[in-house]
Amino acid sequence: MDDNKKRALAAALGQIERQFGKGAVMRMGDQERQGIPAISTGSLGLDIALGIGGLPKGRIVEIYGPESSGKTTLTLSVIAEAQKNGATCAFVDAEHALDPEYAGKLGVNVDDLLVSQPDTGEQALEITDMLVRSNAVDVIIVDSVAALVPKAEIEGEMGDMHVGLQARLMSQALRKITGNIKNANCLVIFINQIRMKIGVMFGSPETTTGGNALKFYASVRLDIRRTGAVKEGDEVVGSETRVKIVKNKVSPPFRQAEFQILYGKGIYRNGEIIDLGVSQGLVEKSGAWYAYQGNKIGQGKANAAKYLAENPAIGAEIEKQIREKLLKAGAAAEAGKAAAVDASADDVADAEAGY
């Protein structure tokens, strides 16, 4: 950059700082880059697939899927994990369907959970914005976008047409909320439902409710599906679940994680620790027996997981090693890609300069 441009840029930056305050514009290299803080989902496999160890704070996340696929269970699991670290959490129950007893079984401290059951979509989103602006709430769940009914629709007649009202409401609210979420470093999760588009010949006919605004504003979008049943004998005790990361602004997208959700218990975390421990060579498997550091911990996966439940310190130790191994490997791969891109950019610059 020549001297005239440098002086013009310095003058512009000085004027911006005087008018809007210090830090309104900054060079990326002036500050040391920091990792994005994350809140665990309760699923070890999903945390690793997300690339940063969980869902990013200060961002909007959308979780969508068919009915009974585990959307609310996953969000309650996020709340339980956040509360373990002293976080304040809120649940905006637009569907009026939150079961405190079930939430308690998943590990949620129901007594400390803030709950709102708003009458209209406007009220729900205004409450969400006020909680964010308080800078005192760490996690907010909105369940669900489909239940955010505009006031005009509630007060109107049953057969009245209200085209695009909900989409406009979501677009306006997200424009207003996004900046506040970043400043408050608050994680806001919107649960969404699936609808079918009529007349689609090619591609997926599935879409989510509430227009396109949430698709753009969300930093992470998770597609959760039930893929099968977990049985003990003939009794169904849970469901096999697959989560696909269809959008991720903080790490590479399109990864997926599979785990089990047990009815009345939540995500089968110890089962995930066993599976990932075996795949990473931290847990030895010989026939039906599982061993850790030479000590047998159980015959069969169920017994090994039961051992970890009875000895949480060992489970936490294995989980810590898995996280360090897989998350560091992912970070190293990303750093390698970034270095390669920087090197190629330098080569192009040198070529243009005639070196």
Swiss-Prot record:
- The name on file for this protein is Protein RecA
Per the record, the gene is recA
Q: Give the matching PANTHER family.
A: MITOCHONDRIAL DNA REPAIR PROTEIN RECA HOMOLOG-RELATED (PTHR45900:SF1), RECA (PTHR45900)
Q: Which species expresses this protein natively? A: Pseudomonas putida (strain GB-1)
Extract the Pfam families matched here: RecA (PF00154), RecA_C (PF21096)
What InterPro entries has UniProt attached to this entry? AAA+_ATPase, DNA_recomb/repair_RecA, DNA_recomb/repair_RecA_CS, P-loop_NTPase, RecA-like_C, RecA-like_N, RecA_ATP-bd, RecA_C_sf
Q: Which SUPFAM superfamilies match?
A: P-loop containing nucleoside triphosphate hydrolases, RecA protein, C-terminal domain
Does this UniProt record's set of keywords contain DNA repair? yes
Localization terms from the record: Cytoplasm
**Upper lineage:** Bacteria, Pseudomonadati, Pseudomonadota, Gammaproteobacteria, Pseudomonadales
GO molecular function per UniProt: ATP binding; ATP hydrolysis activity; ATP-dependent DNA damage sensor activity; damaged DNA binding; single-stranded DNA binding
**Coiled-coil annotation: which residues?**
none
Which keywords annotate this record?
A: ATP-binding, Cytoplasm, DNA damage, DNA recombination, DNA repair, DNA-binding, Nucleotide-binding, SOS response
Q: Which residues bind ATP?
A: 65-72
Which Gene Ontology BP annotations are present? Answer: DNA recombination; DNA repair; SOS response
Tell me where it mainly resides: cytoplasm
